Amino acid sequence: MPASFVAWSIAALAAGFGGLLIGSFLNVVVHRVPAGMSISTPPSACPSCHAPIKAYDNVPVLSWLALRGRCRSCRTAISARYPIVELATGLFFVVVAARIWPLGDVPTEAAPLVAALLELVAFLWLAGASVALAIIDVEHHRLPDAIVLPSYAVGLVLLGASSALSGDWDALLRGVIGMAALFVFYLALALVKPGAMGLGDVKLAGVLGLWLGWTGWGELVVGAFAAFLLGGLFSVVLLATRRAQRTGGIPFGPWMLAGAWVGVLVGGTVAASYLQLLTPA
C-alpha cells in the first residue's frame, strides 16, 4: 500500500473524527455566542432540568442515539439538530481535507508537510466557523464579531506561516487582495443601498475573500458570484411559494458561506471550463 495513500487516509480519518468533536463544540457555540454567554463556563447542562451532562453522555452522535434522543435525568426530548450538526461537521471536514490534500498529493518532506498541515488547519477553521455562522444567521440574523473577527487573524497567521514554509508567497498575496476586494465590494453595496447588506456581511466578506483568494483567482470569482446566484435562486423560490414577503429580510450570510465553499471546492474547475468555452478552438 503506497505511503501517500496511508498518509491521506490517516488525515481524512483524523479530520472526520475531529469534525465530530468540533461539531459537538459548535452546538455550544451557536447556543451561547448569540446570548453573550461564555463558551467554556458553565459546563453543558440539560436546558430543561439543568442537570449537568456527563462526559459519557457527550460523545458526538453516539450518545444521542444511545439515549434515544432524551435527557438521561428528566427524559425530555433532545433536538435532533445536535447529532445532525456533529455528523455534518465531521463529513464537511473530510470533504475539506480531501480538497486540500488530494489523494496522492500529500507532501513527505518536513517543511512542505508542515506548510500543508497549516493550510489544512486554516481551511478546517473556516469550515467550523461556516457551520456556526450559518446556523446563527438563520436563527438570529446576526454574524457575531466573536467568530468573524478572529477569523482574520487565524487566516493571516496560518496561511502566512504556510506561505513562509512553502515559499508560495503568491497564494498569500492573492488572499490579501481577495480579502480587500470582497470587503470593499460588500462595503460599497452596503453604502449604496443601506439595509441590503449588513455590516456583518461586509466583515464576513473580507474573511471569505482571504480564503478564496488564497485558493486561486478562479475560485475567488466563482465563490463571489455563487453567493448571489444561490441567494437569488432561494429568494425566488420563497417568493414563488409565498413563503416570504417581498419586503421580508432573508439572511445573506449562509449564501455567502455556501458560495465561498462552492468556490473553494469546485471554483477552479468551473472557471477553467467557462474560459474554455470562451476561447476559440
Regions of interest found by a model, annotated:
Residues P107-A110, V114-A115, W125-G232, A272-A281:
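Functional transmembrane core segments of multi-pass inner-membrane proteins
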Residues M1-P34:
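Long, highly hydrophobic alpha-helical transmembrane signal-anchor segments
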Residues A12-F17, P83-A88, L120-L124, L149-P150, ...:
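Hydrophobic alpha-helical transmembrane segments
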Residues L26-I84, F252:
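Membrane-proximal soluble regions of multi-pass membrane proteins
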Residues R32-G36, S40, A98-V106, V138, ...:
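Transmembrane helix-loop junctions in multipass membrane proteins, especially transporters and channels
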Residues L26, V30, F92, V96-I100, ...:
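Alpha-helical membrane-inserting segments
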Residues V236-G263, Y274:
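Interfacial loop-to-transmembrane junctions
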Residues S24-R32, R68-I78, S130-R142, Y186-A196, ...:
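C-terminal ends of transmembrane helices
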